Amino acid sequence: GMATKAGTALGKVAKAVIGAAL
């Protein structure tokens, strides 16, 4: 549902931020 989509989006953003930090 919408919660899952939001969670996935946040996960992608988090991974992008972590990748940039590394």
Curated annotation (Swiss-Prot):
The keyword Transferase does not apply. It is found in: Secreted. Signal peptide: none annotated. Its main location: secreted. Keywords: Amidation, Amphibian defense peptide, Antibiotic, Antimicrobial, Cytolysis, Fungicide, Hemolysis, Secreted. It comes from the Eukaryota. GO terms for cellular component: extracellular region. Skin. The keyword Secreted applies. GO terms for biological process: defense response to fungus; defense response to Gram-negative bacterium; defense response to Gram-positive bacterium; hemolysis in another organism. The modification Leucine amide is found at residue 22. Has very strong antimicrobial activity against Gram-positive bacterium S.aureus, Gram-negative bacterium E.coli and yeast C.albicans. Has strong hemolytic activity against human red blood cells. Belongs to the gastrin/cholecystokinin family. This is Antimicrobial peptide 5. It comes from Xenopus tropicalis (Western clawed frog).
